[in-house]
């Protein structure tokens, strides 16, 4: 992965023009975390451990990404990159489970993270 200019990320993190976008991304990450945690518990009861692992991984990266933005971490761009990739993968898993709400939450989060990465690059 190409190393990003973390100094530029820190400057952009406090730029008033992107604060609203970051707030939206934080909310999307937290929503995706909650949806994936909820689905993981239901999926565990249904006996699909391979799906549970993906849902839990997605929930974890979403929460970590939200926290990195909340504390204005210089590394939040890296978190957003990882979150975008994991959420995209998880959305596909949710599609195979027939869970449109979970897939939509994952895709919304992935899109928000992708927008943050574009803005800070």
Where are these regions (language model features)?
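Amphipathic alpha-helical hairpins
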Residues: 1-121
